[in-house]
């Protein structure tokens, strides 16, 4: 069943990307236009003798209107080619300043184009005599902190067929790669990783370390649809002393809980790194502390299964995950409001009210939908129908109203499109599950 859903999602991805493409806007007399990336190949080179790293991105994209194509890279490119010609880029803010992005500094007609960008890789990387530690860990709480933090990428609405070609130049020891893609070893120091076409800039888990730097256990989990799903749980020997047996046991229990509630696990593998305080989710993978493991694996269904298309939809999965963490409690009344659904148009971050007020809002919806079995039947329906399909909040509302036969539009407008500063003080969010870690903290978990 999951295989059929995956193919259906892939067939729909191109049109879905176009329907969720952000609107163009003017900046300094130039029309910034968003593109649909169809494929991106990233050549990631780690030069261990020079202790430097770089990424060369080769991207095929399509624009539907003339203008200056948008992409993003936090790190300034050292070289950019657009349709084979050397160009520069412009770093610019959206009209109301909610986010920053890059433009190709060349007017382009609507249609297919190629974009080649080279950037140095400097974030979350550590060289030593043993090899290199490097990770592309992300956050939905900080601005420009998905894949664009490390290499050129698109906004989260876009599903892209991505490939990594990873080279360890001058490596004396074997490198281990933990990732949620398919790895092929081209030679002793070169690997090609292929990721599914439904992945977005928030989907990829990538972590490489010298062999022997981690403790790990590999095993398989039997899905209710008959698949044997490969799983690995691990932690760094230098930063964490935990129990692989306990980590495996808890991963297994949560896996079966989630399959019982929401159907077959949507992804082909599971990767769990026990590290940090709180956690972050990826498609079938997580970097998490032990206590947040259930929250993060839930996100393989909602966030990295049923996917938000923008920041204003990002609160939904966090509210649902937090509602699960709290035992799916039902409440009949709700005080206050929030602005979780109504931030500025180009917002990319998640409103942290999701962890508190959003959780309570889901409990309120569960009460309202009791005649239809509550909220969970709708959640399973969304996994069945919308897996790997980015959505806007408005689409989520429509799906809920259609499935249940109960209009919830007025409830969302009242409780998630408000001023954002009038919900109860004791519900002000402190997202311990996704606590913001500093770069130094994350560096410690490499």
What are these regions (language model features)?
Residues 20-22, 66-88, 159-176:
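Solvent-exposed beta-hairpin/edge-strand motifs
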Residues 6, 12-53, 429-437:
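N-terminal, polar/Ser/Thr-rich
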Residues 152, 283-292, 312-348:
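Post-HExxH zinc-binding segment in Zn-dependent metallohydrolases
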Residues 74-136, 190:
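A surface-exposed beta-strand-loop module
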Residues 57, 69, 106, 155, ...:
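Zn2+-dependent metallopeptidase catalytic core
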Residues 354, 359-434:
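Amphipathic alpha-helical substructures
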Residues 216-313:
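Juxtacatalytic substrate-recognition/specificity segment
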Residues 50, 58-62, 107, 116-211:
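Extended, low-hydrophobicity, Ser/Thr/Pro/Gly-biased non-transmembrane segments
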């Amino acid at each position: 069943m999951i295989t059929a859903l995956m193919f259906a999602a892939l067939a729909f991805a191109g049109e879905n990307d176009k329907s969720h493409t952000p609107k163009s806007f003017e900046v300094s007399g130039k029309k910034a236009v968003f593109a649909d990336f169809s494929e991106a190949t990233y050549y990631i080179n780690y030069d261990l003798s020079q202790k430097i790293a770089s990424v060369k991105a080769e991207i095929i994209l399509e624009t539907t209107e003339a203008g200056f194509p948008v992409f993003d890279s936090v790190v300034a490119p050292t070289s950019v080619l657009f349709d084979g010609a050397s160009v520069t880029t412009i770093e610019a803010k959206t009209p109301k300043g909610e986010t920053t992005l890059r433009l190709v500094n060349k007017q382009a007609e609507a249609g297919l184009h190629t974009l080649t960008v080279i950037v140095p890789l400097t974030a979350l990387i550590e060289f030593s005599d043993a090899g290199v530690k490097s990770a592309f860990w992300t956050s939905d709480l900080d601005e420009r902190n998905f894949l664009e933090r490390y290499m050129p990428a698109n906004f989260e609405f876009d599903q892209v067929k991505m490939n990594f070609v990873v080279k360890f130049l001058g490596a004396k020891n074997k490198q281990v790669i933990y990732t949620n893609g398919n790895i092929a070893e081209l030679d002793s120091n070169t690997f090609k990783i292929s990721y599914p076409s439904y992945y977005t800039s928030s989907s990829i888990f990538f972590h490489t370390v010298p062999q022997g730097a981690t403790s790990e256990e590999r095993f398989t989990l039997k899905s209710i649809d008959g698949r044997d799903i490969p799983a690995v749980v691990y932690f760094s020997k230098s930063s964490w002393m935990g129990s692989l047996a306990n980590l495996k046991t808890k991963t297994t229990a949560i896996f079966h809980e989630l399959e019982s509630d929401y159907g077959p696990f949507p992804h082909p593998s599971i990767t769990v790194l026990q590290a940090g305080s709180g956690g972050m989710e990826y498609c079938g993978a997580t970097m998490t502390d032990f206590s947040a493991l259930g929250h993060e694996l839930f996100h393989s269904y909602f966030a990295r299964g049923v996917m938000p298309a923008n920041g204003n939809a990002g609160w939904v999965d966090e509210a649902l995950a937090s509602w699960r963490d709290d035992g799916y409690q039902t409440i009949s009344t709700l005080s206050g409001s929030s602005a979780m659904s109504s931030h500025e148009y180009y917002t990319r971050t998640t409103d942290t009210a999701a962890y508190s007020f959003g959780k309570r809002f889901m409990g309120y919806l569960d009460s309202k939908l009791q005649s239809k079995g509550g909220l969970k039947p709708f959640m399973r329906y969304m996994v069945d129908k919308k897996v790997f399909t980015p959505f806007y909040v408005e689409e989520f509302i429509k799906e809920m109203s259609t499935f249940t036969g109960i209009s919830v539009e007025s409830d969302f407008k009242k409780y998630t499109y408000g001023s954002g500063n009038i919900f109860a003080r004791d519900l002000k969010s402190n997202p311990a599950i996704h606590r913001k870690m500093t770069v130094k903290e994350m560096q410690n978990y490499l």
